[in-house]
């Protein structure tokens, strides 16, 4: 499965993974406001041989299937995205 990976210009080290390029319909609007305008980094095959940095491909794949997106945040986060369940 190919996915599109976007980085945040507002939040260093934060990445948003979606199933289809430019399709943010599953991403809550509040999250997108905090994330800022997503900047495409690459298209990535989650079922391929290459690994992702700091995140498990299977976890990303299952989360995208379940909720339509995956949010990767920096290890040193200030808590902005920690309440993702409240944003939904």
UniProtKB/Swiss-Prot annotation:
Residues 1-85 form the YcgL domain. Transmembrane segments: none annotated. Pfam families: YcgL. Gene3D superfamilies: YcgL domain. HAMAP family: UPF0745. This is YcgL domain-containing protein HI_1446. It comes from Haemophilus influenzae (strain ATCC 51907 / DSM 11121 / KW20 / Rd). The lineage of its organism: Bacteria, Pseudomonadati, Pseudomonadota, Gammaproteobacteria, Pasteurellales.
